[in-house]
Amino acid sequence: MMERVYNFSAGPSILPLPVLEKVQKELVNYNGTGMSIMEMSHRSSYFQSIIDEAGSLLRELMNIPDEYEVLFLQGGASLQFSMIPLNLMNTYKKAGYVLTGSWSKKALQEAEKVGEVQVIASSENEKFTTIPKLDGLLGDEKLDYVHITTNNTIEGTKYVDIPHVDKVPLVADMSPNILSERYDVSKFGLIYAGAQKNLGPAGLTIAIIKRDLIGGADRYCPTMLNYETYSKNNSLYNTLPSFSIYVTKLVLEWLKEQGGVSAIEEQNKMKSSLLYNFLDESKLLTSPVDPAYRSLMNIPFTTPSEELNNEFLQKAKERGLVTLKGHRSVGGMRASIYNAMPVQGVQQLVNYMKEFELENR
């Protein structure tokens, strides 16, 4: 059997090894039930306890106030691009979007199908290598909400400070960096995230939504795209991705054992610093991102040529450092170092980068 590799994929991504080992142990016979979670009714008392525990752990780890609901959904963040305007564009039929990368553009394109969209700020002219300044841009606009993407997976940028939005709900796609650093949930009207980066396996989407934003969908909104459907039914309106929720619960337990979000944030800063410190000194490998807005989770870098990039990737794979190829729209390489990536994985990558540079001076 092949030894486990260090998987730097942007998603689906690395999961904590203790979680995988527990899944392996419980896979065939969960908790003495004589069946697997994958076989179990989503309306059984066993699964009810799993989803309740997952919700409680998320509330505890993110310090989610009581006036917010935690919803377990499907369809990924991409379906949220449609659900959000269908539910929230209900007063002015207009929303504000900040463009900071490919995913925020896709969110905007879906919102344009529902109502009017105003681009409040954009870093597209800078090829999304930075985060635009928002001071004074979010004042008295008549908007139903403002949408941001807190971390840009493809481009490798993140917000250092969350923009202050007065009286307008702030909606955030946190798919890549939820639970990786501390956020004040009360600053947001809605937070959403696909699970397959920092929460668990693909198939699950989490929405954390202020209760007063639920129930405003147009009567033509499809039932399955209405937040109220899930709120009224404890997320159990139809069959959920039960296995993904179970694994996510185990990941949340693991995160709590690590010391919670504040502890993992410090570890994430240390891991990213290992990479950025090397890139800042390197004469061969460079980072295209504005240093003021560098992501802790997704770190793109490149060599001067496509030939060297391919050589780097091939030799990395031979060393058990895999899925480092950058997104096709950016090129080069990208190391995604989510919560579950151990420090030694990043250190091994940096050691290899140093050797590669020495070989190609």
UniProtKB/Swiss-Prot annotation:
<comment type="similarity">
    <text>Belongs to the class-V pyridoxal-phosphate-dependent aminotransferase family. SerC subfamily.</text>
</comment>
<feature type="binding site">
    <location>
        <begin position="77"/>
        <end position="78"/>
    </location>
    <ligand>
        <name>pyridoxal 5'-phosphate</name>
    </ligand>
</feature>
<dbReference type="GO" id="GO:0006564">
    <property type="term" value="P:L-serine biosynthetic process"/>
</dbReference>
<dbReference type="GO" id="GO:0005737">
    <property type="term" value="C:cytoplasm"/>
</dbReference>
<dbReference type="Pfam" id="PF00266">
    <property type="entry name" value="Aminotran_5"/>
</dbReference>
<dbReference type="InterPro" id="IPR015424">
    <property type="entry name" value="PyrdxlP-dep_Trfase"/>
</dbReference>
<keyword id="KW-0028">Amino-acid biosynthesis</keyword>
<dbReference type="GO" id="GO:0030170">
    <property type="term" value="F:pyridoxal phosphate binding"/>
</dbReference>
<feature type="binding site">
    <location>
        <position position="173"/>
    </location>
    <ligand>
        <name>pyridoxal 5'-phosphate</name>
    </ligand>
</feature>
<keyword id="KW-0663">Pyridoxal phosphate</keyword>
<dbReference type="InterPro" id="IPR015421">
    <property type="entry name" value="PyrdxlP-dep_Trfase_major"/>
</dbReference>
<keyword id="KW-0808">Transferase</keyword>
<dbReference type="GO" id="GO:0004648">
    <property type="term" value="F:O-phospho-L-serine:2-oxoglutarate aminotransferase activity"/>
</dbReference>
<keyword id="KW-0963">Cytoplasm</keyword>
<comment type="pathway">
    <text>Amino-acid biosynthesis; L-serine biosynthesis; L-serine from 3-phospho-D-glycerate: step 2/3.</text>
</comment>
<dbReference type="InterPro" id="IPR015422">
    <property type="entry name" value="PyrdxlP-dep_Trfase_small"/>
</dbReference>
<dbReference type="InterPro" id="IPR022278">
    <property type="entry name" value="Pser_aminoTfrase"/>
</dbReference>
<comment type="subunit">
    <text>Homodimer.</text>
</comment>
<protein>
    <recommendedName>
        <fullName>Phosphoserine aminotransferase</fullName>
        <ecNumber>2.6.1.52</ecNumber>
    </recommendedName>
</protein>
<keyword id="KW-0032">Aminotransferase</keyword>
<feature type="binding site">
    <location>
        <position position="43"/>
    </location>
    <ligand>
        <name>L-glutamate</name>
    </ligand>
</feature>
<feature type="binding site">
    <location>
        <begin position="238"/>
        <end position="239"/>
    </location>
    <ligand>
        <name>pyridoxal 5'-phosphate</name>
    </ligand>
</feature>
<feature type="binding site">
    <location>
        <position position="196"/>
    </location>
    <ligand>
        <name>pyridoxal 5'-phosphate</name>
    </ligand>
</feature>
<dbReference type="InterPro" id="IPR000192">
    <property type="entry name" value="Aminotrans_V_dom"/>
</dbReference>
<feature type="modified residue" description="N6-(pyridoxal phosphate)lysine">
    <location>
        <position position="197"/>
    </location>
</feature>
<keyword id="KW-0718">Serine biosynthesis</keyword>
<feature type="binding site">
    <location>
        <position position="103"/>
    </location>
    <ligand>
        <name>pyridoxal 5'-phosphate</name>
    </ligand>
</feature>
<dbReference type="InterPro" id="IPR020578">
    <property type="entry name" value="Aminotrans_V_PyrdxlP_BS"/>
</dbReference>
<comment type="function">
    <text>Catalyzes the reversible conversion of 3-phosphohydroxypyruvate to phosphoserine and of 3-hydroxy-2-oxo-4-phosphonooxybutanoate to phosphohydroxythreonine.</text>
</comment>
<feature type="binding site">
    <location>
        <position position="153"/>
    </location>
    <ligand>
        <name>pyridoxal 5'-phosphate</name>
    </ligand>
</feature>
